[in-house]
Design a protein with these regions (language model features):
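Hydrophobic faces of well-ordered beta-strands that scaffold small-molecule active sites
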Residues: 3-9, 54-56, 82-88, 100-104, ...
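Conserved anion-binding
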Residues: 7-29, 96-162
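Short catalytic helix/loop segments, enriched in acidic residues and glycine
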Residues: 21-43
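N-terminal active-site wall of soluble small-molecule enzyme domains
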Residues: 45-98
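Short, small-residue-enriched loops and turns at beta-alpha junctions
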Residues: 60-66, 132-136, 159-165, 215
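Charged helix-capping and loop-helix junction motifs
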Residues: 67-73, 137-144, 165-174, 223-225
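Glycine-rich phosphate-binding active-site loops on the catalytic face of alpha/beta enzymes
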Residues: 89-93, 98-115, 157-162, 188-223
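Active-site/ligand-binding-proximal alpha/beta "capping" segment
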Residues: 145-185
Length: 225
């Protein structure tokens, strides 16, 4: 299974995403670095393991309160061998850097989802987002029509992000059984390697995680596989 570290950016610094309450996110405290800047955290991840994929959430762009675009593009330029999955809110199709894969989240995709997603020609990763009380966010049509989905789909449970409450295993099992031709990615709630083993049983292809790394619950030793 592929483990993908997550970096949440707000106002130019890395913050600790927790429970989906974005207004309350605080500067990150991590065993990987004593500074909450993106380069320190990213290099902390790379000291752990030679990750080839990282996820960056631009929280300012997602909440329409500015953006961290220049900083993110500088990071992509400085680490050309790493693929970055970027969630920058509702974006328009454009020419992205070669190591940039856009994440399109259901929370900001409305009833015109077919027209919007078609513009990307399946060159994106979809995030099916569950809200802070577990509700499905975004257009109902998007959740019901897998033909709109690309090959890779994130099952994002915002209420579990940063919570150390464990993964939404039943939801992931449902999606894997209902849509065996898709590759599902777990996001939210991973506590330790035991949760990773649970996800493997459900044939989850990858997992996004941050807190387990920053708390030292998953270490470099665990990643020697």
């Amino acid at each position: 299974m592929k483990l993908i570290p997550v970096i949440d950016l707000k106002d130019g610094i890395v913050v600790h995403a927790k429970f989906g309450h974005r207004d309350d996110y605080q500067p990150l405290q991590s065993v990987l670095s004593n500074q909450p800047d993106i380069y320190s955290i990213l290099n902390g991840f790379l000291r752990m393991h030679a990750f080839d994929t990282l996820y960056i959430a631009d929280l300012n762009a997602i909440t329409r309160s500015g953006n961290n675009t220049a900083l993110i593009h500088q990071v992509l330029n400085d680490f050309p061998s790493i693929t970055f999955w970027i969630d920058a809110g509702k974006i328009l199709p454009q020419e992205f850097p070669k190591n940039y894969i856009p994440i399109l989240g259901s929370e900001y995709i409305d009833k015109h989802c077919a027209t919007y997603l078609a513009q990307f020609n399946h060159e994106f990763i979809l995030s099916l987002d569950h809200g802070v009380v577990g509700e499905r966010l975004g257009a109902t049509e998007l959740w019901r029509e897998p033909n709109y989905w690309p090959k890779e789909v994130i099952i994002m449970t915002l209420a579990r992000v940063g919570s150390s409450q464990g993964v939404a295993s039943k939801e992931l099992q449902h999606f894997n059984e209902a849509h065996p031709n898709k590759q599902f990615i777990a996001a939210g709630g991973v506590r330790n390697m035991n949760d990773i083993d649970i996800l493997k049983k459900y044939n989850v292809k990858a997992v996004l995680l941050a807190s387990a790394f920053h708390l030292g619950a998953i270490t470099a030793e665990n990643l020697k596989f």
